[in-house]
A protein has these predicted regions:
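Active-site core of glycosidic bond-cleaving carbohydrate-active enzymes
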Residues: 77-335
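Extracellular/oxidizing-compartment recognition motifs
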Residues: 1-71, 80-81, 97-100, 116-121, ...
Length: 335
């Protein structure tokens, strides 16, 4: 195709009689990211390369819309991929208008019933609550980063409509409407119970909506969302935490005990006994040799949650781990 773009490291030119000289080949860098606020340089060569890879990944995936990958034929605006990287992206670059444009696309694609799309701006996709939460999560992230109340004012009606849509989907609970799924901690080495995750996501939605309503001066709605959050939190801790050991469990009562279940519980604020949950996150991380056992939603918060529990050395060991799967393993393989 003549009118397209690709993320790549290497190119191959075929079908020509004479091999072109290197200086005859031109590569054009195109991105919505015009500059980065800062950079990271350390005494650790692999860590420096990792930081560089993050910057290039952001450049390549931010072309008019945030995409899931720049190098293959998909290159779609998956909402789950978008919201998990939002915090990092906003710390790296000034992207307020970029993300507000994405929020507008999600609102434009919202169904009459209130369901948000899993892909924007083209619509469609699948994923459920872990993807459809993106508008609430990102609107609040933008407000925290920039303090512009107009962002919340503009998108609050759509978020409120979505929360109304969620009322009859079975959350909090274990017998849920199929629309809640099907995706959880996507591509994780160890599987975390879907119902544990979906209820945790619902808690964060309700909690953030109470904060958003409070920021907008909508006191009655703030209290309603606070009550919903409290209800979900109570259910989550009674259902997904074993009372004796404090370990996480699946909806059927069997042991879950994954890094993601502990990291999500801490990061989203749904855990009642944060100290105990934090101890289990540290224990689990040590047990798997400081490798990464999380997927889409557990990975980005893992080191931060370890650090917040006072396990700075554990977080550092995980950051510098090169065994598979880890942050630096791809770098050792040439990434």
């Amino acid at each position: 195709p003549k009118f397209t773009f690709h993320g790549y490291r290497y190119i191959e030119i075929s079908g020509v009689e004479h091999a072109p000289e290197l200086e005859e080949v031109e590569s054009l860098q195109y991105s919505s990211v015009t500059e980065f606020h800062g950079s990271l340089t350390s005494s650790h060569k692999l860590l420096n390369r990792f930081a560089e890879n993050v910057s290039w990944s952001q450049k390549c995936n931010f072309i008019n819309i945030p995409t899931d990958c720049p190098q293959r034929n998909e290159r779609m605006g998956w909402a789950g991929d978008t919201h998990i990287f939002c915090h990092t992206a906003l710390n790296n670059s000034s992207l307020k208008k970029f993300y507000e444009r994405n929020l507008q696309a999600m609102r434009d694609l919202q169904t009459p019933e209130g369901q948000y799309p899993e892909i924007a701006p083209v619509g469609g996709g699948f994923g459920g609550i872990t993807y459809e939460c993106a508008s609430i999560f990102m609107a609040w992230e933008l407000y925290e980063q920039y303090g512009d109340i107009r962002t919340l004012e503009k998108f609050y009606p759509g978020m409120q409509k979505y929360m109304d849509y969620m009322k009859d989907k079975g959350l909090p609970g274990t017998k849920v409407n199929p629309a809640i799924g099907p995706l959880g901690d996507w591509l994780a080495p160890e599987e975390t119970d879907l119902l544990l995750l979906w209820n945790a996501f619902y808690y964060k939605e309700a909690d953030l909506m109470s904060r958003i309503a409070g920021a907008l001066g909508r006191t009655e709605e703030q209290h309603q969302y606070e009550a919903l959050a409290a209800k979900v939190k109570k259910f989550w801790n009674e259902t997904f935490v074993l009372p004796d050991s404090g370990k996480t469990c699946n909806a059927d009562g069997t042991l879950c005990d994954t890094q993601c279940s502990y990291a999500i519980a801490l990061s989203y604020g749904v855990a009642e006994d944060r100290k105990r949950i934090g101890e289990h996150l540290i224990r689990k991380t040590r047990a798997i040799g400081y490798t990464v056992g999380t997927g889409f939603f557990g990975t980005g918060i893992l080191n931060q949650m370890l650090t917040e529990q006072g396990a700075v050395e554990d977080a550092w060991k995980m950051m510098l781990q090169t065994a598979f799967p880890s942050w630096l393993y791809p770098v050792t393989q040439g990434a």
